[in-house]
Amino acid sequence: MTHYKVTLAYDGTNFAGYQVQPKQRTVQGVLQKALTKMTKGQPVHVDGSGRTDSGVHALGQVISFDYPGNIPAESMLKAMNSLMPLDIEILKAEIVDADFHARYSAKGKRYLYRVARGYYTNPFNRLYTGHYPYKLDVQRIEVALKDLVGTHDFTSFAASGGVIVDKVRTIYEATVREDPVTNEIIFEFYGNGFLYNMVRILVATALEIGNGRRDVHDFQRLFAVKDRQQARGTAPASGLYLKEVYY
């Protein structure tokens, strides 16, 4: 057996998320089917760094798996890409130690969220951005995001469907910038881990701060109250990208 670490990108639009589900097209399912074809029927299980939801994209998802035989990394890259659909690209393949695990070896992740501005939805980027047609003070958002940096209890920002009890996470960076070319604002969050829907809830809250509907330091209040209902909104899946996983 040879142990591989593979980095890939995908357009999440036509996937029912990353994780295998019965009778659904998923990223994990497509990967495992391709690898099983390469082994001529011997099942290959793939571990991912995390589960992305339906409609969420990845610029740098990481998987790991054991493969029977010893294929050079570059050959694995080419072989996998030859079996990928148009909405998945294998970016890099590496042979790693057997104890490497895409999820459990990860030290941190970086997510990006794109928000399209303008009153009307652009039909050509609607599957790749969120959309916010209301006024925004980006400087207010910049101030607010500084309150996220550090170690906090993110109970208010975790979707009710999650099963993880410990909701304390550390955020190393939280930024927002304007892209005048695309008329978008782009959020980035880098932390040691993220709860279910956490980034999308943080973005929805930040947009309400930028719109003046919330106090500029409302993140601090939401940390204290530990109440998901008070954070309210969740930004659409379409604007979210898993940008990078750190090891």
From Swiss-Prot:
The gene is truA. GO terms for molecular function: RNA binding; tRNA pseudouridine(38-40) synthase activity. Formation of pseudouridine at positions 38, 39 and 40 in the anticodon stem and loop of transfer RNAs. It comes from the Bacteria. GO terms for biological process: tRNA pseudouridine synthesis. Substrate binds at Y111. NCBIfam families: hisT_truA (TIGR00071). The keyword Plastid does not apply. The active site is at D53 (nucleophile). Belongs to the tRNA pseudouridine synthase TruA family. The lineage of its organism: Bacteria, Bacillati, Bacillota, Bacilli, Lactobacillales. This is tRNA pseudouridine synthase A. Keywords: Isomerase, tRNA processing. InterPro entries: PsdUridine_synth_cat_dom_sf, PsdUridine_synth_TruA, PsdUridine_synth_TruA_a/b_dom, PsdUridine_synth_TruA_C, TruA/RsuA/RluB/E/F_N. Homodimer. Coiled coil: none annotated. Disulfide bonds: none annotated. It catalyses: uridine(38/39/40) in tRNA = pseudouridine(38/39/40) in tRNA. The keyword Isomerase applies. Its EC number is 5.4.99.12.
